[in-house]
Structure formats: structure tokens, C-alpha cells
Amino acid sequence: MTDNNKYRDVEIRAPRGNKLTAKSWLTEAPLRMLMNNLDPQVAENPKELVVYGGIGRAARNWACYDKIVETLTRLEDDETLLVQSGKPVGVFKTHSNAPRVLIANSNLVPHWANWEHFNELDAKGLAMYGQMTAGSWIYIGSQGIVQGTYETFVEAGRQHYGGSLKGKWVLTAGLGGMGGAQPLAATLAGACSLNIECQQSRIDFRLETRYVDEQAKDLDDALARIAKYTAEGKAISIALHGNAAEVLPELVKRGVRPDMVTDQTSAHDPLNGYLPVGWTWEQYRDRAQTEPAAVVKAAKQSMAVHVQAMLDFQKQGIPTFDYGNNIRQMAKEEGVANAFDFPGFVPAYIRPLFCRGVGPFRWAALSGEAEDIYKTDAKVKELIPDDAHLHRWLDMARERISFQGLPARICWVGLGLRAKLGLAFNEMVRSGELSAPIVIGRDHLDSGSVSSPNRETESMRDGSDAVSDWPLLNALLNTASGATWVSLHHGGGVGMGFSQHSGMVIVCDGTDEAAARIARVLTNDPGTGVMRHADAGYDIAVDCAKEQGLDLPMITG
């Protein structure tokens, strides 16, 4: 049966305050975060349930959304809701320390794990692409990836430019839910940036939310602005309406030399996320319905041109890296044999953090009050007094990042500190310092929760890039530890067949029971990241495991 229930002309907004609409905060929290994912301030295309990342949805269709909401409002604290690719399929008796929701999205048996088969199922209403935090109900807008992008740019500055990006500029493309973080991250890291985007509506959204500073009228204007701002040492972000597969080759032809090149277009999904050269967006969307194979071919041909230009920049000695959208794979399939000559961002800049379980720890204020986030910011500084880099991030985040939907914060911390912060937040709820409970979650892009050979697990030391036992173990352990909701997805970030990953969210409601769950979950979750990297032979991870007292029988036993 074809699914015709993916569009509804409605605006969704999560309830605010401390009055429950469900039976407890353990069910109110997933309800509010589901709704928050579809807030028009948060989602890319909420009327079609699309949160970010091409077609990353929060629910399979509107009938499923309605039934999820209805079920969460009646769910008891000894029951668990099962969600299968965005559809609520069952409620079962469990116990009070079990997750209230268990989610599996987009998972396919490996032989069938490709876009063609998935799209057939999607068209029949039998599947949903959950991306990473879209279908797991913990997306917080572009802030969710700002710090990770910032950390990447800062580390690139350390490695290539002596620790400073002042007077430098980044060339990139894509201003969607993930890519939209790039201009602000570059600015916070001290660099100018030129951000190419083919949809004017996305540029408008990033201008409105202050993620990008200016829009140039054409390429010449953009380059003039870049030249002016870099000469003045100013970190200003510039958007340019255009197609990266046209603009990058033109820049190569002109001999323009950026200081860093990357990309965050939705190249992972050629049918829905990458505009072929010479096409309008309307043509692209229409032909995706009538000629999907031709659309995919045209998109991948344009990606090949795009990647070739990136390779041309790299040949000039310009730091060039993939930012996790699988564009190198798409280009390789289209004949660019050396597409992987430039690295992904994780092996190039982020893996040492993952070895210590450091990753995108995030929290949201269910109250809707910004002041609750500012109080937690202060608590983080109090509990981690000597980390000047982290303090600078929090100060910049408060000054520059506009909240989208429920106020939230992201803060990269690792094993040991996550549990410490979570317990402190729970105590703040208990004492009344915070006006309502907090939810703590993370991106699936974390140290122990994803297997993705072209992104997070690219070039693992022991060659275990494609082993996907690790996110399964992470999901199982978070379930056993008492996370409030746990998710297990396929295909996020890099597309069907290229990743498996898991997520968790835990509620801080101020109770003793919550404190026990928080201590378990926020220790065990990052602990799996240290375990995974120690098992792969990374000395940093082995040392961290020993320092933190992890029991790893083959390593610390």
C-alpha cells in the first residue's frame, strides 16, 4: 500500500513548563522531544515530518505520529513502547528501570541494505529513514553539530596553521540541518568561510538563526568579501546561492586558494539530497518521483565533478577533508578512482577525542526556559574548572548560538565527566534550581555507538572499520542500564549500507531512581567508546580505560 500521509499543514511545538501532559516525566520527555524535532524552528521540512539530512524523519507518517503521541500520553512507568521505523508497533510490560521507548529505524538485512530497496519500502509505507537524531527524537537544530565542527576546525588549525585560523578561510557547501553548523563553527574557530548552498530557503534560515553572517550576490562578490575580511583578520561567514559542483571547479580554474576545503551537502542520499548541475530544485524533486534512476545517476555525476575539484585543491597542498556525507564513495562509484585520497574528518582530527570517550554530550530543558540552560552552563564550568577550551566554547555558545525549539546545549565531554554532570543536573532539578526536568542525550556520532567505515570508523588501526557489533552492544548496554529511550539505526550520515549506529536519552527528573540510572548510563555509554578504541589498539584508549577503572578482560584484566 502506498503511503500518502506524509504531508500535513500544521505547526508542532512541544509543551513548555512543569505541567505534565503524559503520566510521568519519563514519558513526557520523549513526547516533548518528538514534538521538538518537528518544531518549525528546528526541523528542515516539518510538514513532511523531515527533521534534517535529506529525508530523515521523526515518524513514518502523520498517522504514526498521532498514534505515538497518543500512546506516550497513556504509557505507564512499567511499560515500554516499541517503535519500528517510525511506527508504534507495540506496548509491553517491562519494569520501572527499563527504557520507556525502544526504537529501531531503517534497519535492513545487509544484502538488501541499499537505497533502491529502502526506497521501494519507503514508497509502500513500510520503512522510514531515521538519520541519526531525527528518528530518535534528540535533534536540537544545527547547534547539535556546531561544537564537533568547531573542534574539527580548531584541530585543523593546530595541525596546519600553527594554532590560529585568523586571516584564513574555509570553502565548503551545504547549509542544511548539519551543514548549517559550518559557517558559525568556522567563525567561532577564527576563520572566514564561503558556504555554497543550492536552496535559497536554507540560506534564509541560517541567516535568520545567525548561523551565517552574510549572503553574497554572486561568486565575484563572495571572493571580494573573503579577500577583505581575511585581510582585516575578521571571522565572517558568507553564504553563496549556487551549486558546489559548478562553483568549486570554477574556483580551481581561477586559481583561487582557500585555506581549508570540506563539504556537508546531503551527498549520502543522491535521490533526495544533492542537486545535479544545471537542474532547478523543482526539476530535481519532480524527476525524483518519475525517474529516480536518472536522478541518482545525474546527482552522482555531479558529485564526481565536485570531488575532483576537492582533489585538485588537495594537490595544491590545501588541507581537504570529507565531513562524513559519503561524497567520496559516491564519486568513486562514478569513476573517480582516487576519491579517497583526501581523508575523513574523524581519522584526520577527531579520533584522539573518541579514544577517551569524548563526544557530543547534549541536553535540553523541558521547561522551555533559556535560564535553565544558562544555569547548567554555569554548573559545567563549576565542575570542570580547569578546562579553558571548554569554558571558551560555553561562552561563545551563549553569545552566538540561537536556541531552536526547546533550549539546549552541546558540550563535548567524555568518560567520567558525563556522569558527573548528569548527576549534578539531576540534583538541580531535585532542589528546584531548574524549573523542570532535563533530558541528556547525544548524537549517534559518538565514540562507541557507530560503525561507519567511511566516517567514524574510517581507517581503524586494526582494520575493524566495518565491524558493527559495537553499536549493537552499545544499544543493548544502554537498555540494560536504564536509559529512558534507546535507538538503533542504519544508514545515518552516509546512507544505506554504510553505517549502523545507536543512541540513548536519559531523563533527569530529580529522583533517587533517576540518579542511579544516570550514573549507570552516563558511565557505561561513553565507556563503550573507550572499550571499542582500546580493543582496536589505541594506546590513548587503553590508558583511559585503566585510569577510569574499566573492566576490559582482554586489556585491563
Swiss-Prot record:
Disulfides per UniProt: none
Pathway of action: Amino-acid degradation; L-histidine degradation into L-glutamate; N-formimidoyl-L-glutamate from L-histidine: step 2/3
Top-rank lineage group of the source organism: Bacteria
Enzyme Commission number(s) from the entry: 4.2.1.49
Record InterPro entries: Urocanase, Urocanase-like, Urocanase_C, Urocanase_central_sf, Urocanase_CS, Urocanase_N, Urocanase_Rossmann-like, Urocanase_sf
Disordered, as annotated region: 445-464
Active-site residues annotated for this sequence: C411
Residues binding NAD(+), per UniProt: 53-54, 131, 177-179, 197, 202, 243-244, 264-268, 274-275, 323, 493
Compositional bias ranges of the Basic and acidic residues kind: 455-464
GO CC entries: cytoplasm
Cofactor(s) essential for the protein: NAD(+)
Keyword NAD: yes
Keyword match Lyase: yes
Database matches in Pfam families: Urocanase, Urocanase_C, Urocanase_N
Location of this chain's protein in the cell: Cytoplasm
GO molecular function: urocanate hydratase activity
Major subcellular location class: cytoplasm
Entry's cofactor comment: Binds 1 NAD(+) per subunit.
GO biological process, one term: L-histidine catabolic process to glutamate and formamide
Entry keywords, A to Z: Cytoplasm, Histidine metabolism, Lyase, NAD
Annotated function: Catalyzes the conversion of urocanate to 4-imidazolone-5-propionate.
Family affiliation: Belongs to the urocanase family.
PANTHER family reported for this sequence: UROCANATE HYDRATASE (PTHR12216:SF4)
Protein name (record): Urocanate hydratase
Organism from which the protein derives: Pseudomonas putida (strain W619)
Source taxonomy: Bacteria, Pseudomonadati, Pseudomonadota, Gammaproteobacteria, Pseudomonadales
